[in-house]
């Protein structure tokens, strides 16, 4: 019986790692070195840390999982996840843990397989826009934006990777009058 429990634990660990590897926020943080020169090692460590967190805390609420993942992303990768994916990943991990607790290795294998089939490769490419603030000084301020594109990672699937869409294009762009002379950007509250 202990062998079956160990097998399910291994499947749970693999499912957790698959979910984290497919998480676009973590992919971007690793690819752009937000965690420093050891970003890839931190991402691998993150899988084990999340697995251990679930094992040590048997009855976790969704908010606790979100807080834990958000804290790890902030401390290890200097990244605040604001794309709405944190609750989705947390829910997915919580479902995996429930399957682990029931000893349902088949469900864990199925979830891992589905994640690997749908896995998208996300890349962030910088877009540079420049605005002259003072013609006499020839001083140019630039605002760097990131364009996120999703490409299939070679998996054979007919599904299309969803592109993140801004909720309101007018609120997402930095208006010219919001950039003042000294390079600061004025942030306005939504109305």
UniProtKB/Swiss-Prot annotation:
Keyword Acyltransferase: no
Top-level taxon in the UniProt lineage: Eukaryota
Annotated region (Disordered), positions in chain: 140-175
UniProt KW rRNA processing keyword: yes
Keywords of this entry: rRNA processing
Disulfide-linked positions: none
GO biological process: rRNA processing
PANTHER family with a match to the protein in the record: PRE-RRNA-PROCESSING PROTEIN TSR2 HOMOLOG (PTHR21250)
Function noted in UniProt: May be involved in 20S pre-rRNA processing.
Protein family (similarity comment): Belongs to the TSR2 family.
Protein name: Pre-rRNA-processing protein TSR2 homolog
Gene that this polypeptide is encoded by: Tsr2
């Amino acid at each position: 019986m202990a062998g079956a429990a160990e097998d399910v634990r291994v499947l749970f660990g693999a499912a957790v790692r698959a979910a984290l590897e497919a998480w676009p926020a973590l992919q971007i943080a690793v690819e752009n070195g937000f965690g420093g020169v050891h970003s890839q090692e931190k991402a691998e460590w993150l899988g084990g840390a999340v697995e251990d967190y679930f094992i040590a805390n048997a009855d976790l609420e969704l908010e606790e999982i979100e807080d834990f993942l958000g804290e790890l992303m902030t401390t290890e990768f200097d990244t605040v996840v604001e794309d709405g994916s944190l609750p989705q990943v947390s829910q997915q991990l919580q479902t995996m843990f429930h399957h682990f607790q029931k000893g349902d290795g088949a469900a864990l294998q199925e979830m891992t397989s589905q994640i690997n089939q749908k896995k998208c490769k996300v890349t962030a490419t910088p877009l540079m826009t420049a605005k002259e603030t003072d013609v006499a000084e020839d001083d140019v301020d630039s605002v760097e934006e990131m364009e996120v594109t999703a490409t299939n990672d070679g998996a054979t699937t007919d599904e299309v990777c969803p592109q993140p869409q801004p909720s309101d294009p007018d609120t997402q762009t930095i208006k010219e009058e919001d950039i003042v002379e000294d390079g600061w950007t004025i942030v306005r509250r939504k109305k």
